[in-house]
């Protein structure tokens, strides 16, 4: 919690300075800092709630297309500042999940995709692809996998096995952007609590793909 409090103070101070020293400037810079604050506060809140997640669950039908659009809308400032464009494909699927927790997970993954975009690419070349696929039925169940793929800087191979560890920032977090090391940890833990599978593949200089697999029985689909 202390780490979050420290990180929250920085954008608050920056927002105050921008507002005080540049009263005639557009509000974009202030909005950017406030978006950072909202993201950090959201992480802190979901971390606190994760201890009693069973009491906060509400599993129901979730339209992937709608929840992805909501997550992107709430992260619009992050994408604009990073010059990243979202692309969609085959999201017309309904899954069983808690919409609040799933949207939080998506927002964290989308923030990371924008934060670690490739600085050598022009704004129109920085892309995040969001897509989904449904598996063939097997032993009474089927699964839907949601993919968040980017063409960013990628994750060093030696960091891949630790990116879901609590507090791990890795080389990218230290070099390119300030990181609490809690976003991906929370995503992984919340996925486990909802019986979802979160995986990642990445190559430095090429980008990363995060996958969320949601299993469903035939009775869930009826």
What is each model feature region?
Residues 125-141:
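Short beta-strand/loop element within the Bergerat-fold HATPase_c
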Residues 113-117:
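Short helix-loop "hinge" at the ATP-lid/N-box region of the Bergerat-fold HATPase_c
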Residues 155-167:
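Short conserved segment of the HATPase_c
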Residues 150:
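Acidic ATP/Mg2+-coordinating residue in the GHKL
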């Amino acid at each position: 919690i202390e780490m979050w409090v420290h990180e929250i103070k920085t954008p608050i101070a920056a927002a105050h300075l921008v507002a005080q020293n540049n009263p005639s400037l557009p509000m974009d810079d202030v909005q950017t800092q406030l978006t950072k604050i909202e993201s950090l506060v959201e992480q802190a809140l979901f971390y606190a709630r994760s201890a009693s997640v069973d009491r906060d669950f509400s599993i129901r039908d979730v339209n992937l297309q709608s929840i992805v659009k909501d997550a992107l809308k709430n992260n619009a400032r992050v994408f604009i500042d990073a010059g990243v464009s979202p692309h969609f494909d085959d999201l017309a699927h309904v899954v069983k999940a808690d919409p609040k927790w799933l949207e939080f997970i998506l927002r964290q993954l989308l923030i990371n995709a924008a934060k670690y975009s490739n600085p050598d690419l022009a704004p129109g070349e920085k892309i995040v692809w969001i897509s989904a696929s449904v598996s063939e039925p097997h032993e009474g169940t089927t699964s839907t996998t949601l993919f968040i793929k980017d063409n960013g800087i990628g994750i060093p191979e030696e960091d891949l096995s630790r990116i879901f560890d609590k507090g791990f920032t890795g080389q990218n977090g230290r070099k390119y952007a300030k990181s609490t090391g809690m976003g991906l940890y929370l995503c992984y833990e919340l996925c486990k609590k909802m019986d979802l599978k979160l995986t990642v593949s990445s190559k430095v200089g090429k980008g990363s793909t995060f996958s969320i697999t949601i299993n469903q029985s035939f009775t869930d689909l009826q």
